[in-house]
From Swiss-Prot:
SUPFAM superfamilies the UniProt entry points to: EF-Tu/eEF-1alpha/eIF2-gamma C-terminal domain (SSF50465), P-loop containing nucleoside triphosphate hydrolases (SSF52540), Translation proteins (SSF50447)
Identification of the protein by name: Elongation factor 1-alpha
Subcellular location: Cytoplasm
Annotated binding of Mg(2+), by residue: 31
Pfam families linked to this entry: GTP-eEF1A_C (PF22594), GTP_EFTU (PF00009), GTP_EFTU_D2 (PF03144), GTP_EFTU_D4 (PF14578)
Region described as G4: 163-166
Documented EC number(s): 3.6.5.3
Positions of region (G2): 80-84
Organism for this UniProt entry: Pyrobaculum islandicum (strain DSM 4184 / JCM 9189 / GEO3)
Residue intervals passing through the bilayer: none
Binding site residues for GTP: 24-31, 101-105, 163-166
InterPro entries attached to this UniProt entry: EFTu-like_2 (IPR004161), EFTU-type (IPR029459), G_TR_CS (IPR031157), GTP-eEF1A_C (IPR054696), P-loop_NTPase (IPR027417), T_Tr_GTP-bd_dom (IPR000795), TRAFAC_GTPase_members (IPR050100), Transl_B-barrel_sf (IPR009000)
CC annotations in GO: cytoplasm
Length: 444
């Protein structure tokens, strides 16, 4: 049976590549909208989709067909049909867009942090349905939390899809109300809402996704695909040392160990001698593959599977980082970071021990010192060595990882220098690393 989602067409690989995080509160229609985008751009296998549609009809759940594209794909992925199938992509006129970390995992926020740290842009999906919108951007809403996260993780470009317009009868007033409230939130986060497209869509019916809808005569902006086409692919740092955080590791019969990840900086070539840290294991690159195509070399932004000789699957795990032996990624003994406290019920002092999510790694850490508290607007220190910090504060802190992890200065390697701290099932803080005290690493 063919995979439900088709691999990139030859035309796609000629286009600049952009990684897109799809964010928003649960049940606001992220999966349906992603399914619709893939379908409208010709990236869904017709035959497999017909089966899904018929099944949905039989069960009286026609509205679920587009969301089920991703469910079917996830099942294929769990059965191990392909090695780098964690990503799906589609084309606009100018770009090839990879959707990172598909929505719908229970662990979504955790995966979303990993995903957002690799994102060049974000699609924020918000439901127009009464109650759903209010919950999503309320104080406990994931929609609000996701926006805070991508802001802190450095995602500058956003498009907003106001979804489920069919449920509110394409009411312009409701659209304007949502646009105004989301704009307020975006402004608070330092975005300029006048530069952000808000598109009234229905993922289920297809309004304004690929073609202009007659149901919204009052709307004269771009369609969703046109809006996504306005994203600027970021410059790719090819001249920096190689860094590739590992997302997954497999053993493939007849091939050996394959590590999967996205090249953040530098260039990786077949034949390179590489090192994976923290385990400090050395190996040689046998082959590189992306979306079922063999590559001689991979550049920043490429999501790849790398076949490494000399390293066994047991030696490597998600969160390790691949680099070259002549410039080994930094394993951190201690870091100094600027953090913003997004949520905490009381106050945070030295000794506080949350979990850090940094690139693809998750490690327990301890805050060992509060260095200073900053004015969020100017970045100037307003208090040295505060006793505690609380929700809304911005501070410089010293953090000690309780297990080995790779961390770099944000100014040198942005994707390995930004992180989130989580505790109690919530994102407590997000931060950027200013300094790293390196740990001793013995290359094996």
């Amino acid at each position: 049976m063919p995979s439900i989602i088709l691999p990139p067409k030859p035309t796609a690989l000629q286009k600049p590549h952009l990684n897109l995080a799809v964010i928003g509160h649960v049940d606001n229609g992220k999966s349906t909208l992603v399914g619709r985008l893939l379908y409208e751009t010709g990236y869904v296998d017709e035959k497999a989709f017909k089966e899904i549609e018929e099944m949905a009809k039989k069960m009286g759940k026609e509205d679920f067909a587009f969301a089920w594209i991703l469910d079917r794909f996830k099942e294929e992925r769990e059965r191990g049909v392909t090695i780098e199938a964690t990503h799906v992509g589609f084309e606009t006129n100018k770009l090839f867009i990879t959707i990172i970390d598909l929505p719908g995992h229970r662990d979504f926020i955790k995966n979303m942090i990993v995903g957002a740290s690799q994102a060049d842009a974000a699609l924020f999906v918000i439901s127009a349905r009464p109650g759903e919108f209010e919950t999503a951007i309320g104080p406990q809403g994931q929609g609000r939390e996701h926006l805070f996260l991508i802001r802190t993780l450095g995602v500058q470009q956003i498009v907003v899809a106001v979804n489920k317009m069919d449920i509110v009868n394409y009411d312009q007033k409701r659209y304007e109300q949502i646009k105004a409230e989301v704009s307020k939130l975006l402004k608070l986060l330092g975005y300029d809402p006048s530069k952000i497209h808000f598109i009234p869509v229905s993922a289920i019916k297809g309004d304004n996704v690929k073609t202009k809808s007659s149901n919204t005569p009052w709307y004269n902006g771009p369609t969703l695909l046109e809006a996504l086409d306005t994203f600027q692919p970021p410059p790719r740092p090819v001249d920096k040392p190689l860094r590739m955080p590992i997302q997954d590791v497999f053993t493939i019969t007849g091939a050996g160990t394959v590590v999967v990840g996205r090249v953040e900086t530098g260039v990786l070539k077949v034949g390179d001698r590489v090192v994976i840290v923290p385990p400090a294991k050395v190996g040689d690159v046998r082959s590189i593959e992306t979306h079922h195509m063999k590559l001689e070399q991979a550049q920043p932004g490429d999501n790849i599977g790398v076949n490494v000789r000399g390293i066994s699957k047991e030696d490597v795990r998600r969160g390790d980082v691949l680099g070259k032996v002549d410039n080994v990624p930094t394993v951190a003994e201690e870091i100094v970071a600027r953090v913003v406290i997004l949520w905490h019920p009381t106050a945070i002092g030295p000794g506080y021990a949350p979990v850090m999510h940094i690139h693809t790694a998750t490690v327990p850490v301890q805050i060992v010192e509060l260095v200073s508290k900053l004015d969020p607007r100017t970045g100037q220190a307003v208090e040295q060595k505060p006793q505690f910090i609380k929700q809304g504060d911005v501070a410089i802190v010293k953090i000690k990882p309780l297990k080995p992890v790779v961390a770099e200065k944000f100014s040198e390697f942005p994707a390995l220098g930004r992180f989130a701290l989580r505790d109690m099932g919530r994102t407590i803080a997000a931060g950027q690393i200013i300094e790293v005290k390196p740990a001793q690493v013995q290359i094996k």
